[in-house]
Amino acid sequence: MARSYELTRTTGETDISLRLNLDGEGKADIETGVPFMEHMLDLFAKHGQFDLFVKASGDIEVDAHHTTEDLGICIGQAVKEALGTKEGIKRYGNAFVPMDETLAQVVVDLSNRPHLEFRADFPSQKVGTFDTELVHEFFWKLALEARMNLHIIVHYGHNTHHIIEAIFKACARALDEATAIDPRIKGILSTKGLL
């Protein structure tokens, strides 16, 4: 059974069409009008081995806030829907990713209990034209809509681009681990019987 989901979301601020395949090959085709997010989502797909296709337009003449936030919403919804009943998944994922002087860790629990613990500081407020505070907005919406417990910890680093890139790569790897099917797991990995 294919674990993929396709959606379109249109608001007064953004118009997003998206397709996500959890069991992909790391293929990506991303058009958002926000070059830095395109770079990060391309990395996210490659390092998570997800196939991710996104076409988004938004009010980027104002700033990238709405587009970045709504991308988190849409990718989160796609993850949740692609997982279906969550039968057989590992549920938990943990990844450390170094990027030169930076070390980032991301831990995921696909628990149906949304929470974001975000322990990252960015030395610069911008990377190019991209506002770095939007990284938190993206991951909060991702966690909320995917209904996952997401912990992001940057152990150290001083280059803002490296810090953000390490976070996205670590999130991809942790999510790949958490969504992986383990044939030893019968049903859902919870004593409650559901997630």
From Swiss-Prot:
- Enzyme class comes to lyase
Instruction: Kindly give the Pfam families that the UniProt entry links to this protein.
Output: IGPD
Signal sequence annotation: none
This protein's UniProt keywords: Amino-acid biosynthesis, Cytoplasm, Histidine biosynthesis, Lyase
Q: Which domain of life is it from?
A: Bacteria
Subcellular localization(s) per the UniProt record: Cytoplasm
Q: SUPFAM superfamilies this protein is in?
A: Ribosomal protein S5 domain 2-like
**Gene Ontology process terms (BP):** L-histidine biosynthetic process
Its EC number(s): 4.2.1.19
Pathway per its UniProt entry is: Amino-acid biosynthesis; L-histidine biosynthesis; L-histidine from 5-phospho-alpha-D-ribose 1-diphosphate: step 6/9
Q: Which GO terms describe its molecular function?
A: imidazoleglycerol-phosphate dehydratase activity
Identify the GO cellular component terms for this protein: cytoplasm
Q: Which reaction does it catalyse?
A: D-erythro-1-(imidazol-4-yl)glycerol 3-phosphate = 3-(imidazol-4-yl)-2-oxopropyl phosphate + H2O
Its chief place of residence is cytoplasm
The family classification in the record reads:
Belongs to the imidazoleglycerol-phosphate dehydratase family.
**What is this protein identified as?**
Imidazoleglycerol-phosphate dehydratase
- Organism of origin: Shouchella clausii (strain KSM-K16) (Alkalihalobacillus clausii)
